[in-house]
Amino acid sequence: MVSLYLENGLFLQAQSFGASGTQVGELVFNTSMSGYQEVISDPSYKGQFVVFSMPEIGVVGANPKDDESFFSCAGVLARHYNEFFSNSRADSSLSTYLKKRGVLGISGVDTRSLIKTLRHHGCLMMIASTIEHDRNKLEEVLKNAPKISHSPLVSSVSTPKIITHQRATFDFNTLDYKPFDEKIPHKIIAVLDFGAKGNILNELQNVGLKALIYPHHTKANELIKAYEKKEISGIFLSNGPGDPLSLQQEIGEIKRLINAKIPMFGICLGHQLLSIAQGYPTYKLKFGHHGSNHPVKNLETNAVEITAQNHNYCVPEEIEEIATITHRNLFDNTIEGVRYKNAPIISVQHHPESSPGPKESHYIFKEFVGLLEGF
């Protein structure tokens, strides 16, 4: 059994199918119908519980080759967990996978009702425990727990040292991963790692870019010198967890990189940090965008793209003073992409690499290559 307590006073008890223990985090909902493993292993969900709108979970098991990272969300909530998986590539059940990663698995919850609660109240802090079941004690622990905006989440998911990305890329012909080809000429880019998904790095690799992954706290001078020496051709700012406004030191360094006119590309948190660094602070959405079925309009082509999304924060409309808005969300008309006028920078709020989700926005990686070739 697992007991849940939300900051709005809701107390629930359900079945446990994951790890044992107690976790505190922010509760968000995800509307993806598949790809639960990629969601669970996405560093952007660090410090969060994910409730899936898809009522069934576990039917394809789990395969560690498909992980986005070594990091995980705090826990997952589903209407029904299916222990009997069917997938030729799976090597364990989802339950076994969650236990290995220390992730709580919670089933038997009325997820429809819970998601409606989140839509009404917004994202809520929550505590879940397989150990403590007293409502008052859970309430007390949650009351004294730090808010997610005050937690140093990025530092817990960023690389501690500079490394080269050489992860193999999935081959749909063989249904396995093919090795990185060192013989192919690659432009080298620096990746500021705020919690990068593995498939973002794979897609950068697939368009001919070799990624050197730098810690989130890397000084701007180090990257500027590398660019001036032609050791790198540009900089990519990754996705990541938490409130972008909590990263004040990193924002100061990004401001220096912008002033140096280095070609840059940001996704999700990276997109937000580029905005804040130029004086346009983000604001928090009521319940965020989480899922792989969000329509986004490309304002330059008028095409509508179905995208993968995972964020709680958004850049403000005032960004139009220094940037051309290239994409908008068709659910709420929020900004999804910009091209800056004052520097060679593009950024998007959604995830063009998908994983999970459609790849209708994959062309953005090629746009970044074109940006690099222009400098």
From Swiss-Prot:
Function of the molecule: Small subunit of the glutamine-dependent carbamoyl phosphate synthetase (CPSase). CPSase catalyzes the formation of carbamoyl phosphate from the ammonia moiety of glutamine, carbonate, and phosphate donated by ATP, constituting the first step of 2 biosynthetic pathways, one leading to arginine and/or urea and the other to pyrimidine nucleotides. The small subunit (glutamine amidotransferase) binds and cleaves glutamine to supply the large subunit with the substrate ammonia.
Active site positions, chain numbering: C268 (nucleophile), H351, E353
Listed EC numbers: 6.3.5.5
SUPFAM superfamilies registered for this protein in UniProt: Carbamoyl phosphate synthetase, small subunit N-terminal domain, Class I glutamine amidotransferase-like
Gene Ontology molecular function terms on file: ATP binding; carbamoyl-phosphate synthase (glutamine-hydrolyzing) activity; glutaminase activity
Secretion signal, residue range per the UniProt entry: none
Occurrences of domain Glutamine amidotransferase type-1 (ranges): 188-375
Superkingdom: Bacteria
This protein's encoding gene: carA
Enzyme class: ligase
Species this chain originates from: Helicobacter pylori (strain J99 / ATCC 700824) (Campylobacter pylori J99)
Protein name: Carbamoyl phosphate synthase small chain
PROSITE patterns cross-referenced by the UniProt entry: GATASE_TYPE_1
Keywords linked to the UniProt accession: Amino-acid biosynthesis, Arginine biosynthesis, ATP-binding, Glutamine amidotransferase, Ligase, Nucleotide-binding, Pyrimidine biosynthesis
Record-listed L-glutamine binding positions: S44, G240, G242, L269, Q272, N310, Y313
